[in-house]
């Protein structure tokens, strides 16, 4: 029953890569039961969702170019701390874990260019995090452009203290143990009411985290 969908949610491919194929909606279209509104203000209908799901099932966004699974995910509530830094979407923390040790992390902030998604390949901001203190350091816009401030503001990206930092690291390590992968990137968001929540696990977490931290994984 399409009408049973909540006012806000995310639709994702199971084996997607680089944020491709993800749709995030922020509320129902006023006076319509068959449509929702996305971050950029555009409208998406039930027919649009059906078409997108067919594309996901056909493997259009699959990293292996094979038939995939589509799933709906609840949209979390934004933590007040991140409100000035994030454009509409929910930030998350990507933690790289290798052999049960968290070795690198970054805060990912959605932007207007990324359509409210915390994905650097689509134009989000990545901010390196000091592993000992959970405090942000250097930042990158997209995949390679080093920045100091939130675009078009004087809001510094360094010096943000990540709440629940030790809990986030523990969750990331536990996720790696359960997955039985020796190396992965755990994406963890902080819900306003529930605290840290796992969004997804990535067997190929990308290279941008090294740029954001101005450091290579090999040295860790």
Regions found by a protein language model. Name each.
Residues 22, 113-122, 208-213:
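A short, polar/proline- and glycine-enriched secondary-structure boundary/capping micro-motif
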Residues 127-157, 168, 172-175:
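Intrinsically disordered, low-complexity Ser/Thr/Pro/Gly-rich regulatory segments
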Residues 94, 187-189:
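Short, surface-exposed charged micro-motifs
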Residues 37-141:
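Phosphate-binding site of ATP-dependent enzymes
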Residues 1-4:
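Short amphipathic alpha-helix with an adjacent loop that forms part of the alpha/beta core around
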Residues 149-167, 177-181, 190-220:
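C-terminal active-site "lid" helix and adjoining low-complexity regulatory extension at the edge
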Residues 10-53:
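Glycine-rich phosphate-binding loop of ATP-grasp-fold ATP-dependent ligases
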């Amino acid at each position: 029953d399409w009408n049973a969908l909540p006012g806000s949610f995310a639709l994702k491919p199971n084996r997607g890569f680089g944020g491709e194929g993800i749709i995030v909606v922020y509320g129902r279209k006023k006076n319509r039961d068959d449509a929702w509104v996305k971050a950029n203000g555009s409208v998406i209908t039930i027919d649009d969702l059906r078409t997108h799901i067919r594309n996901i099932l056909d493997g259009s966004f699959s990293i292996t170019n094979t038939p995939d699974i589509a799933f709906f995910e609840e949209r979390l509530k934004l933590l007040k701390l991140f409100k000035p830094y994030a454009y509409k979407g929910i930030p998350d923390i990507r933690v790289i874990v290798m052999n049960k040790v968290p070795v690198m992390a970054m805060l990912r902030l959605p932007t207007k260019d990324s359509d409210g998604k915390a994905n650097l390949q689509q134009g989000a901001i990545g901010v390196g995090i000091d592993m000992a203190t959970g405090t942000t350091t250097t930042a990158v816009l997209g995949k390679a452009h080093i920045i100091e401030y939130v675009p078009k503001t004087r809001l510094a990206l360094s010096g943000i203290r990540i709440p629940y930092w030790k809990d986030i690291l523990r969750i990331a390590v536990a996720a790696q143990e359960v997955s039985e992968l020796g190396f992965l990137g755990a994406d963890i968001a902080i819900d306003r009411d529930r605290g840290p929540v796992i969004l997804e696990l990535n067997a190929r977490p990308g290279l941008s985290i090294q740029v954001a931290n101005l450091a290579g994984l090999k040295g860790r």
